[in-house]
Amino acid sequence: MRDGPADQLIPAGFRIRADPGARLAGQILTGGAPVRLLRLSAAGARQVTAWWAGEPVSASTAARTLARRLLDAGIAHPMLDGAGAPGPADVTVVVPARDRLPMLAACLASLTGPGQPPVIVADDGSADPAGVAAAAAASGVRLVRRALNGGPGAARNSGFALVSTPFVAFVDSDCVVRPGWLAPLLRHFADPAVGAVAPRIVPHAPAPSWLSRYESASSALDMGPREGAVAAGGRISYLPTAALVVRAAAFGPGFAEDISVGEDVDFVWRLAAAGWRVRYEPGSAVEHQHRDRLRPWFSRRQHYGTSAAVLEARHPRAVRPFYVSRWTAAAWLAAAVGQPAAGAAVTGTATALLARRLTGVTGNRQLAWRLAFRLAAGGTLAAARPLGAAISRAWWPAAIPLAIAVPRLRLPLAALVLTPPLLDWADLRPALDPARFVAGRLLGDVAYSVGLWQGCIRQRTLYPLLPATSTSGSPRSPACQTRS
């Protein structure tokens, strides 16, 4: 992967806005995922206040450095008006395809027309190459054919080899783009450090079945309604390449051709490791034709699960089912074994120690306690959701025998497993009753878990099954380090 630009600072004149979770109290700024606490100088606090009010970033190195830090941390997001951004003439669309002719035809119909970028279809060893060629010819697009099937990564690379524009948009053949989909993505490239941007993936013409309605509300490809920076271990840790716009200068060797699953996550993580910024932009939407039959849907989820061990081999320690502080882990462990009072005591101790540390940082005891409660106590409560998801997605082969052997663990484990899907149902309000929504979530988690364990056995690794622990929430938490 090619290294990112030498100048990593935000361009002067950029505008940024606060993430909904960001809080500025005096000179203390908190926010991001994982939550960070920054102690600003008086000038820095005034600058952030001005940015939140809509003022542009000045040309000073200090301002541009701070703005970049806030964007990278997820405390702020860019306000983009299109100034300095590339246009459709700067983009070539590459569609990797293997048969699925009706889907390909629908995809090309959505991509072609007056004012649209040129399109290249990369035929990945289709069984009916004449049909793919006919679909490409009917749409008036260029075709490159691979004699042997090499997987979607290899097909994308073959298409990219013919690209001469400074940007390339990869769109899978089972996708249909909406009018105006490209402009919100291209605006991000006014920042020269941005290497890739992806839109939100939404369902295309969902069928009336319960599974289709579940996928419409909770697809594995849908990263949700909140924009953000993409980084391993962050709130948005990966992007699917069902649709992805990439700066050609950042493409480097491209997608890995020796893996058939997880090549999209691997590509995005290598981009980030090389110094490029990757963004998720839900203001642009691309429709995906989801699987709505149970067997292929289960098989696809299982296939996704096998990618974790493959990615672990390429990005050590980057794939974990659960990220937790040791204080939070101790509190939940105490509660799980029937000692909730002990768990509350652990959380209270962590909060008090953190408040003591933050008092020295902020010089304000009341503010320190508010922050400590949010970071330590609030973080412990919020951990219920990812903990329950980790049990159903990774640890159920151990959790079920444990619940059978230790009856008092049955209710806590069941509550933890059911909490995430029920909370998601309440948040999403899908066109599906809670029982079937929960059933769909748990069935998908089991499918993913089967693939996860299969991949770990093949790769002979346990790391994708192990939680990542830290001292977060303690007085020495990285989240509590001060920065001026």
Residue ranges, per PLM feature:
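Acidic donor-binding segment of Leloir-type glycosyltransferases
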Residues: 108-145
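N-proximal low-complexity "stem/linker" segments adjacent to membrane-targeting elements
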Residues: 2-12, 16, 20-40, 46-110
